[in-house]
A protein has these predicted regions:
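Flexible glycine-rich surface loops and low-complexity tracts that mediate binding to linear polymers
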Residues: 87-90, 131-147
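Membrane-interface amphipathic/re-entrant loop segments adjacent to transmembrane helices
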Residues: 169, 173-178, 184, 369-381, ...
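Beta-strand/loop nucleic-acid-binding surfaces
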Residues: 112-129
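Structural detector for short beta-strands of small beta-barrel domains
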Residues: 81-97
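N-terminal leader/targeting segments
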Residues: 1-79, 155-156, 174, 278, ...
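Aromatic-rich juxtamembrane segments at the membrane interface
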Residues: 2-11, 151-282, 287-288, 438
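Short aromatic-glycine-enriched beta-strand elements
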Residues: 95-106
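Hydrophobic alpha-helical transmembrane segments in multi-pass membrane proteins
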Residues: 16, 20, 55-60, 214-382, ...
Length: 488
């Protein structure tokens, strides 16, 4: 009797679906051609046919085609460079320099006509518009601006304010307008509670780095702790765990619905960063799996989050935080177990923590090279110190900010714990030695090979703990050579 064939990949349909969605998003972003709809229809038809025939790889062409169709509907820049009167609502303040402040406006009206996308605007530092305010000014738009993401919105225009600036202090309408006003008030509360560390506190608790000075930003970056200044999966995970702990009870679906609502509110108040949205979707999939009594599968949760967010906006691939967030979890899912077997103490908790830190470092290294080119070895042990401290900053920090309008003195007492954690993180980031290296830019081919090698090294490929992953390590070695020699 013939032995049953083993699958090459121990996975669900989300793995080919994730590959198809990534490929479709890359093609859509690189080409940006409205005629992609024809190829997209072919992909969807092939995926539907494979689904009817119950072929396991049906998700690959299906989501590839859907992403092409979504890309064909993506708007392009419609306004040429020049000077125009503009108006828009301030939704983010990503940076502040000595002489200027950067503000992101959405929706944007240029010469009275609404245009797709958001506008990144440089205004004088004295102006400092508040969240939710409507800003009116004359702007000189740049030619060929770099398309990127700020929060959930795609920045398609960039410019500098000219002449006078006027603002309408009334916040936007609806629930989103309320959330912007609430975020502005929370930033004022954070400044009162956590001074002189209010800049890092606003970054860690609210995702606003506009008050983080250059020296502090560089200290966090060079020490490998920059991820703490951005609201990410760590923050959403802590928020979700605390919410579930506070609403214990027998009605599980009611608990989950309330937890999802509060996590969504948390993401809204922290700027709807793509990394936070990724964590929220994964948390939703995890809770649904628990309620439906399904086996926990990190790769399927990651694939579901990736597919949903790319269908929402394919140009999220241009967002560094989005890519680093997915790269981090991808490394944890694929590399934690293989590395825990190689490192000393692999069967113990400290070995698992060390394997997780190395997994994140290896998975995000090529992406970091495309952002700045510096890799910090110090970030590995410092992350082992900083991540366990994060709940002691996030939970009492948010509790103090929410308590401050009612009981200011009690809020200041609660804030003593996060102030101590902030002081410790600031000292560690400032005093930590710079032990790293500058690496060349990782091209597209080495990047693809690198992540393919990570998958082939993992237990998802021909799962067998006794089998050395020769193929995976070979692919990683080839990717490393191509990366370091900059041949491609």
């Amino acid at each position: 009797m013939e032995a049953p064939r083993r699958r090459f990949f121990n996975c669900r349909p989300m793995l080919p679906g994730m590959v198809g969605a990534l490929a479709g998003a890359i093609v859509a972003v690189k080409l940006g051609n409205p005629s992609l709809w024809l190829l997209g229809l072919w992909g969807v038809a092939l995926g539907a046919f494979a689904l009817v025939r119950r072929w396991e790889w049906f998700a690959l062409p299906l989501f590839f085609g859907l992403l092409l169709l979504r890309g064909a509907l993506t708007p392009t820049v419609e306004v040429p460079a020049g000077t125009y009167p503009i108006s828009g609502t301030v939704i983010n303040r990503p940076a502040r320099r000595q002489l200027s402040t950067t503000a992101v406006l959405y929706p944007v009206y240029i010469s009275g006509t609404r245009v797709p996308g958001a506008l990144q605007l440089s205004v004088p530092a004295a102006a400092r518009p508040a969240y939710g305010e409507t800003l009116f000014c004359t702007v000189t738009l740049e030619e060929d601006p770099t398309v990127h993401c700020q929060g959930p919105f795609v920045v398609m225009y960039a410019g500098r304010a000219r002449g006078g600036i006027s603002t309408n202090p009334s916040r936007g309408e609806g629930f989103y307008g309320w959330s912007l006003a609430a975020r502005e008030r929370l930033e004022g509360v954070a400044g009162a509670l956590f001074y002189p560390w209010d800049g890092p506190a606003k970054g860690i608790l609210l995702g606003d780095k506009s008050d983080v000075d250059f020296l502090t930003y560089e200290a966090y970056r060079r020490s490998g702790l920059l991820h703490l200044l951005t609201v990410s999966g760590l923050h959403v995970g802590v928020a979700g765990a605390v919410i579930l702990a506070l609403i214990r009870g027998r009605r599980r679906w009611l608990r989950m619905a309330l937890a999802w609502t509060l996590v969504a509110l948390f993401c809204l108040l922290t700027g709807l960063a793509p990394s936070a949205l990724r964590a929220a979707v994964m948390l939703l999939c995890f809770h649904l799996g628990l309620q439906l009594r399904r086996q926990d599968d990190g790769l399927s949760q990651l694939g579901c989050a990736l597919i949903l967010l790319l269908l929402l906006e394919p140009r999220y691939l241009l967002c560094n935080g989005f890519c680093l967030s997915f790269g981090c979890i991808y490394g944890l899912v694929c590399l934690s177990r293989p590395l825990s077997r190689l490192l000393p103490g692999g069967g113990q908790r400290r070995g698992s923590l060390l394997a997780g830190a190395f997994s994140v470092f290896f998975a995000t290294a090529p992406l970091l090279s495309r952002v700045g080119g510096d890799l910090s070895w110090v970030g590995i042990p410092l992350s082992l110190l900083a991540i366990p401290l994060a709940p002691f900053l996030l939970v009492p920090g948010w509790a103090a900010m929410l308590l401050y309008p009612l009981l200011p003195q009690a809020a200041r007492a609660v804030a003593l714990v996060p102030r101590g954690v902030l002081l410790l993180l600031q000292s560690v980031a400032t005093l930590a030695p710079w032990e790293g290296l500058s690496v060349p830019y990782c091209g597209d081919l080495p990047l693809i090979l690198w992540y393919a090698g990570i998958l082939l090294v993992s237990d998802l490929f021909l799962p067998n703990a006794r089998r050395p992953a020769y193929l995976g390590w070979s692919v990683l070695f080839v990717a490393l050579v191509l990366w370091m020699t900059a041949l491609v």
